[in-house]
């Protein structure tokens, strides 16, 4: 299985630096690639990528701004792998992440999966509070944190896996935002693909929203 990590970014070089630092410490030793899609940024991350050129297999693409869903599709079209893993740029990836994903897919293969998110001790108080609110069953129902308490699991694109076949058949994310994540899940189900949660495939999600924006959700 050849993984391609798909990471759209918009004006977030500092986040990309933290994300790539975590990927440089991966315990996974098979070949994989990282595809960075710069979505029309005015503050580019190219200098950050140069720091990791001798440590990571990175492909970089700059394109006009068209939003996160279209940028993920662009990255998957350019990628060489047969299984794509999509991250937000504000995620930090545990060293055993790809090992856990590979083991889970070997045991029970699906064409689309999602994983939970957690907060690191180093996150700010507001980031920890928002993370709790987004992942607690008492608030959002635990959907974004990976709860299996309701219906079919709908992966979220901050931490999502998608096979090349499922991408090619579904054409990936639709041209809607927000709402592209559940839209993709529903279309995959209609096409006969299955989705699942991989509890061990969690990421540390350093959410960059504030209380005012969070209250709207």
Task: Please report, for each region that a protein language model flagged, where it lies by residue.
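Short aromatic/hydrophobic "clamp" motif used to bind/position activated sugar donors
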Residues: 84
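Cell-envelope/extracellular polymer assembly enzymes that use nucleotide-activated donors
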Residues: 2-4, 33, 183
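Short, acidic, metal-binding catalytic loop of nucleotide-sugar glycosyltransferases
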Residues: 21-31
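Conserved donor NDP-sugar-binding/catalytic core segment of glycosyltransferases
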Residues: 95-128, 201-202, 206
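Catalytic donor/gating beta->alpha subdomain of glycosyltransferases that bind UDP-sugars
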Residues: 174-217
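Glycine-rich, basic loop-to-helix element that forms the pyrophosphate-binding segment
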Residues: 63-79, 100, 150, 154-158
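A recurrent flexible, glycine/aromatic-enriched loop bordering the glycosyltransferase active site
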Residues: 119, 140-165, 176-178, 183, ...
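A conserved acidic beta->alpha catalytic loop
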Residues: 22, 38-47, 65-66, 88-94
């Amino acid at each position: 299985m050849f993984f391609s990590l798909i990471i759209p970014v918009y004006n977030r070089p500092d986040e990309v630096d933290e994300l790539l630092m975590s990927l440089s410490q991966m315990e996974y030793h098979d070949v994989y690639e990282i595809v960075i899609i710069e979505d029309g940024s005015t503050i580019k991350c190219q200098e950050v990528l140069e720091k990791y050129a001798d440590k990571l297999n990175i492909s970089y693409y700059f394109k006009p701004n068209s939003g996160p869903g279209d940028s993920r599709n662009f990255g998957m079209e350019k990628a060489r792998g047969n299984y794509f893993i999509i991250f937000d740029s504000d995620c930090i990836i545990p060293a055993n992440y790809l090992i856990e994903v590979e083991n889970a897919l070997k045991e029970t293969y699906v064409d689309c999966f999602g994983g939970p998110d957690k907060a690191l001790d180093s996150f700010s108080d507001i980031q920890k509070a928002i993370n709790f609110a987004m992942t607690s069953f008492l608030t959002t129902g635990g959907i974004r944190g990976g709860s299996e308490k309701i219906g079919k699991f709908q992966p979220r694109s901050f931490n999502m896996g998608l096979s090349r076949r499922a991408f090619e058949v579904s054409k990936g994310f639709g041209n809607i935002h927000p709402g592209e994540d559940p839209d993709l899940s529903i279309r995959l189900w209609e096409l006969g693909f299955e989705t699942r949660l991989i509890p061990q495939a969690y990421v540390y999600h350093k959410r960059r929203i504030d209380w005012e924006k969070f209250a709207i959700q």
